[in-house]
Amino acid sequence: KVAKKIVEHAADYGIKPQDVVVDPLVMPIGAISQAGNQVFELVRKLRSELKVNTTCGASNVSFGLPQRSGINNAFLPMLIAAGMTSAIVNPLHPELVQAIRAGDVLTGVDDGCTKWISAYKEPLKEGENPREGRRRRRRA
C-alpha cells in the first residue's frame, strides 16, 4: 500500500515507476522464520504490479546468526531471481560478489555469461596459443 502511494505521488511529479526505488525492508531470519520468503514475494509483487526497482540491506537477513556469509551468499541469488534490482552489500567479500554474478548468470541478466567469463576465465600462461592453451590443459 505504501509503495503504491509513493508511485502515485511520484507520477504527479512526472517520475516514472521504473525511476522509483523501493526498499522492502529485509528482516532477520533468526527472528522471523519466513522473512526470506516474505521479501521474495514482496519483491515479485513490486516488480510485477508497480514496475519499480528494488533495493535492500541484504545482510539484514542474517543478523544475529553465526556464519552470516553462508546465508548472505545464498540469499542474494534468490533475491535476484525474485526480481531485486540492487542491494547494499560489502563488495570486499569475494564469495558474495561471486554469488551475485552467479545469480545474474542463472537469471539471464548476464546474457551469454560474458561478465562471468570475463571475471573468472583462466588466464593464458606465458607463450600459450590463445586457441590451444586452455584446450590442452583441459585434456591433461
Locate predicted features:
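Terminal or standalone catalytic/regulatory effector modules within metabolic enzymes
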Residues: 124, 129-140
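Catalytic alpha/beta core domains of metabolic enzymes, predominantly
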Residues: 1-128
